[in-house]
């Protein structure tokens, strides 16, 4: 049972790290788009202020 709990904890940590890395990547891409053309509003009504999709 302990091994299964350890594996689950490791999997959860890896998934959390992967999600955080993807969010950082998306934030960087969003900023690059804003920097490329600051005259165009990239606001999308489906996005919440924290960058998550509704």
Swiss-Prot record:
GO terms for cellular component: extracellular region. Coiled coil: none annotated. The modification Leucine amide is found at residue 36. Pfam families: ELH (PF02323). One of its GO terms (biological process) is neuropeptide signaling pathway. It comes from the Eukaryota. The keyword Transmembrane does not apply. GO terms for molecular function: hormone activity. Disulfide bonds join 25-53. InterPro entries: ELH. It is found in: Secreted. Keywords: Amidation, Disulfide bond, Hormone, Neuropeptide, Secreted. This protein consists of a large 36-residue subunit, bound by a single disulfide-bond to a small 18-residue subunit. Belongs to the molluscan ELH family. Injected in sexually mature animals califin C excites LB and LC cells of the abdominal ganglion and cause egg-laying. This is Califin-C. The lineage of its organism: Eukaryota, Metazoa, Spiralia, Lophotrochozoa, Mollusca.
